[in-house]
Amino acid sequence: MSSPRQTPLHEIHEALGATFTEFAGWRMPLRYTGDAAEHNAVRTAAGLFDLTHMGEIRISGPQAPEALDYALVANASAITVGRARYTMICNSEGGVLDDLIVYRLGEQEYLVVANAANAAVVSAELAERVARFEASHEDVSDDYALIAVQGPKAVDILAPLTSTDLSTVKYYAGYRSEVAGARVMLARTGYTGEDGFELFTSPADAPAVWQALADSGAEHGLRPAGLSCRDTLRLEAGMPLYGNELSAELTPFHANLGRVVKLDKPGDFVGKAPLAAAAEKPTERKLVGLRTDQRRAPRHGYRVLDAGGAEIGVVTSGAPSPTLGHPIAMAYVDRDHAEPGTALQVDIRGTAVPVEVVALPFYRRNA
């Protein structure tokens, strides 16, 4: 068995005292000082993340827009240069293979960013799907390190390091720039529910970019942040995680994300027919939020019960919420039990713990 890969920032993480975990073949920082402190820093100031384990695939050529229109559920042709789109790649039955962000870097050039655990699958699927078009596929994951600065102080931290006027960088914009003298692809995207930026830079430049951000952020309360708090941040924001809320057995419509499926775009795309059928028929189960005032948190895989104790769903993600002060969870439940305010229970190791259905997201930042 091969050893996990290390990011270009590994020595920095070690010096910061990080606790590591192996994830998707990478040795990644799980936490530095503590989950709650890192989580709260992102909500109130800013956190600095190493996300180099994500996968990047470049699609380019005269028919790159048409190729991605066919390969993904998005209308890639409609993405303007310098903007990004949240989308999904589905199988022929409409099941989700991964959720993605697609950046349009030029008229004939896109960068597709895949989740680490699915990067190889996404790259292989894209290679096969774009082969029928006048477009090329290149897995460029090794060309990039990915650093994210997330939180309400992100603009204050990044602004002194770039000549780009950050007030002009809209949410879900992404284009080439410079940060701390390094060439980057600067994107106003993230997975925390806060404002922030993701910086795609070369592995060689990554340590200097990280250190420049850390130095600039020192006066603003910036903390290095690990994958553990990233999970509680995205949970509070109601953002899905592949393998939990999303899978090849579920369509985007199951996860309340039917809006990303562009059935009206020109031409065919992989999964179009079953997705069109799914759009016309409500799913049997719906993704909902759950909250409880009890001490123990519902966790992935726990059974959801109705008031009489009958099983009516399953928890997909759950944790104590540092921001809200009580446990929260997302779960798939039968539609007739999905209305906010519905009283349900979760079987937590043999104990039926009362929970209430609530609307998603649990947390929404102030604009």
UniProtKB/Swiss-Prot annotation:
Keywords: Aminotransferase, Transferase
Gene Ontology terms describing biological process: glycine decarboxylation via glycine cleavage system
SUPFAM superfamilies per record: Aminomethyltransferase beta-barrel domain, Folate-binding domain
A GO MF label: transaminase activity
InterPro entries tied to this protein: GCS_T, GCS_T_bac, GCST_C, GCV_T_N, GcvT/YgfZ/DmdA, GcvT/YgfZ_C, TrmE/GcvT_dom1
EC number(s) on file: 2.1.2.10
Enzyme class (EC, first level): transferase
Gene3D superfamilies referenced in this protein's UniProt entry, alphabetically: Aminomethyltransferase beta-barrel domains, Aminomethyltransferase fragment, Probable tRNA modification gtpase trme, domain 1
Annotated catalysed reactions: N(6)-[(R)-S(8)-aminomethyldihydrolipoyl]-L-lysyl-[protein] + (6S)-5,6,7,8-tetrahydrofolate = N(6)-[(R)-dihydrolipoyl]-L-lysyl-[protein] + (6R)-5,10-methylene-5,6,7,8-tetrahydrofolate + NH4(+)
Pfam families membership: GCV_T, GCV_T_C
Keyword Cell membrane listed: no
GO CC, alphabetical: cytosol; glycine cleavage complex
Family according to the record: Belongs to the GcvT family.
Functional note: The glycine cleavage system catalyzes the degradation of glycine.
Subunit and partners: The glycine cleavage system is composed of four proteins: P, T, L and H.
NCBIfam families: gcvT (TIGR00528), PRK00389.1 (NF001567)
Protein name: Aminomethyltransferase
Species name: Saccharopolyspora erythraea (strain ATCC 11635 / DSM 40517 / JCM 4748 / NBRC 13426 / NCIMB 8594 / NRRL 2338)
